[in-house]
Amino acid sequence: MKRVLVAMSGGVDSSVAALLLKEAGYEVVGAMMRFWPDLPPPSLEAGKPRAWESCCTPDAAYEARRVADRLGIPFYLLDYREVFEEEIISPFLQDYAQGRTPNPCARCNTFVKFGALLKQARRLGLDYVATGHYVRKEGLALLRGLDPHKDQTYFLWGTPKEALPHLLFPVGGLTKPEVRALAEKAGLPTARRPESQNLCFVAGDLKGFLKERLKPRPGPLVDALTGEVVGEHEGASLYTLGQRKGLGLYKTHLERYVVGVDPERNVVYVGPKEACYFEGLEGEGLNLLAELPEEVEVQVRYRTPPVRAKVESLSPLRLRFAHPVFAVTPGQSAVFYRGERLLGGAVIRRGLYNLAGLEDPRALTFS
């Protein structure tokens, strides 16, 4: 009998993943990785979650254990706080401090779930690690989830190629309503649990978290086209490319977007919307799960459709889009597809071929 470790989050997707694998005849072991700091014990009253409702919190651990008890499988809480701080939180803060906008969920899959956790599972003699991701797997190929509204391949581009034979994604061929229906039928306590919308390590709003950890200082908002100071920002690390709201412009009639961030000089550059459009990108940290053809589809944000692009070079990685793309943001993921198949991805270093002909704003002087 094949043995599988199911990474349980306390949500319905990983709960149903465990259910399906047990029904398929696997020997299932449930586990949750503890990422959070020491907090007060969770409320044990069913249906009364804490205000901090997210995956991998104490309340979520309680729900995951209830699911394991219902399924009759063992459940373990694994202490991954040190690994998570080193591999996820520290790089996350460093990226923001450098004016980038990171994608911690993609990094977590690469280095924690399909890195450290898989290695531990193999050491314990388990054959597979399974998750509740909406991803399909055919042989060693990863395909978009059947439910287009829930597809999560965007976050799996960094999966180590050598990990692919040991990964299972049981809910990838289902829609979210089907997953909830299976959970209801099996009497799983997570059947109606709301989806987590927050980063698992941010107890509140992201801006407040960054202010607490990075201690940003106010500084000038500079028009990238004229060099004029047009407002004051709250701290360069709090802004991202393409942002329009909350800029603090002196002249409120101006329609301006963030077009660049210079954390060294503590300057945020703003400009017209067209200055946020790019016809290409340069990437770093390329990870390929399949051969990259000369022309690919590339997705630069989770909720935006992919755009056709030509691969100009691999070292450095440079792509040219078939049409301009808004807010090609340093630190975010550029993920490559051929049809429904995930080919790999990279971290965006910078956008190329700016539609407004804008140079790197950090090279500008201002008054």
Curated annotation (Swiss-Prot):
Gene Ontology molecular function terms on file: ATP binding; tRNA binding; tRNA-uridine 2-sulfurtransferase activity
InterPro entries: MnmA-like (IPR004506), MnmA-like_C (IPR046885), MnmA-like_central (IPR046884), MnmA-like_central_sf (IPR023382), Rossmann-like_a/b/a_fold (IPR014729)
Pfam families linked to this entry: tRNA_Me_trans, tRNA_Me_trans_C, tRNA_Me_trans_M
Residues that, per the record, bind ATP: 7-14, 33, 132
S-S pairs: 108-200
Enzyme Commission no: 2.8.1.13
Active site: 108 (nucleophile), 200 (cysteine persulfide intermediate)
Gene Ontology BP term (one): tRNA wobble position uridine thiolation
Keywords in alphabetical order: ATP-binding, Cytoplasm, Disulfide bond, Nucleotide-binding, RNA-binding, Transferase, tRNA processing, tRNA-binding
Subcellular location: Cytoplasm
Region (Interaction with tRNA): 150-152, 301-302
Catalysed reaction, written as an equation: S-sulfanyl-L-cysteinyl-[protein] + uridine(34) in tRNA + AH2 + ATP = 2-thiouridine(34) in tRNA + L-cysteinyl-[protein] + A + AMP + diphosphate + H(+)
Enzyme class: transferase
Family: Belongs to the MnmA/TRMU family.
Name recorded for this polypeptide: tRNA-specific 2-thiouridylase MnmA
